[in-house]
Amino acid sequence: MTAGSTGLLDRLRTAGIDPGDSDEQRLNKSLLMFATGLASVASMLWLVIYWSLGPQLSSTLPFAFQILLAVNLAVYIKWGNFDFFRVSQLSLFLFFPFVVQWSIGNFISASGITIWGLLAPVGAILFMGTRESFAWFAAYLFLLAMSGFFDFHLASAEMQTKQQIPIRTAVVFFALNFAAVSTIVFLLLRFATIEKQKAQERLNEAHRMLQIEQERS
């Protein structure tokens, strides 16, 4: 990776961070920027594989997801409203997978794409806190239950009206969706843990220097 690309990544990761932000606020902002980047890369990979397999379905919604992520990110970088950015990004993570599933057909034909919605409550834990994350998880479960309810009761009608996805294509995207979400969650947790360890090391170093100064005085 070149110095220019590394500098760009660093600027994106620290975008919106103010000098007066606490360590926790800095971590929350960095995590959400990291999550946005991971989701963008994963959805781009999703589109590339989608086009290579050539299913007869529109890729408008997945492409629109990328556009919305980018626009929301640009708005945040320009105006710096982290609360709006946080809620709007998590809302995209939560609702968009279900919209895509409903447009395709059902849980099976959409290859379990609703698993992407799990990024919203997981992200809420990391970016907001445990108490705030409960509402996001409840919303995810509600959408999942509602989708399952309608899939169960409208299964026969959907089989007749919705275009069928080749089984091999469905299997590929089942694996891709679960692998992508699992990877994003793992990388986010790993990043959060590393950053917290760095913060603890800085705190320990500051405490050590303070003790040295006290011993000298």
Placement of each model-derived feature along the sequence:
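The cytoplasmic-loop to transmembrane-helix boundary for the fourth helix
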Residues: 128-150
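Membrane-water interface at the C-terminal end of transmembrane alpha helices
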Residues: 125-136, 185-194
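Amphipathic alpha-helical coiled-coil "transmission" helices that mediate dimerization
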Residues: 186-187, 191-194, 198-216
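Non-catalytic regulatory/interaction regions at protein termini and inter-domain linkers
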Residues: 1-25, 56, 155-160
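Alpha-helical transmembrane segments and their immediate juxtamembrane flanks
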Residues: 85-86, 95-98, 146-198
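N-terminal membrane topogenic signal
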Residues: 23-36
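Hydrophobic transmembrane alpha-helices and their membrane-interface boundaries in multi-pass
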Residues: 34-109, 113-123, 140-145
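Membrane-interface elements of multi-pass transporters and channels
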Residues: 19, 55-56, 79-82, 106-107, ...
